[in-house]
């Protein structure tokens, strides 16, 4: 039972870290895509 009580928080921490890692990887890409879209709309140079 003690092992399970140690394993559960560890797995929760690792999953939350993985989610944070994915978000920190996706957010810059989304901001770059949005800025490129806005720039393209204002300059009419791309799709």
From Swiss-Prot:
Keyword flag Signal: yes
Signal peptide segment: 1-18
Alphabetized UniProt keyword annotations: Signal
GO cellular component labels: plasma membrane
Tissue specificity as recorded in UniProt: Expressed in cells harvested from milk of lactating women. Not found in other tissues.
Similarity comment: Belongs to the PP3/GlyCAM-1 family.
Protein's recorded name: Putative glycosylation-dependent cell adhesion molecule 1
Source organism of the structure: Homo sapiens (Human)
Lineage of the species this protein comes from: Eukaryota, Metazoa, Chordata, Craniata, Vertebrata
């Amino acid at each position: 039972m003690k092992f399970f009580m140690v394993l559960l928080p560890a797995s929760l921490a690792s999953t939350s870290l993985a989610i944070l890692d994915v978000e920190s990887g996706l957010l810059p890409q989304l901001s770059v895509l949005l800025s490129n879209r806005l720039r393209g709309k204002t300059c009419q140079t791309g799709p």
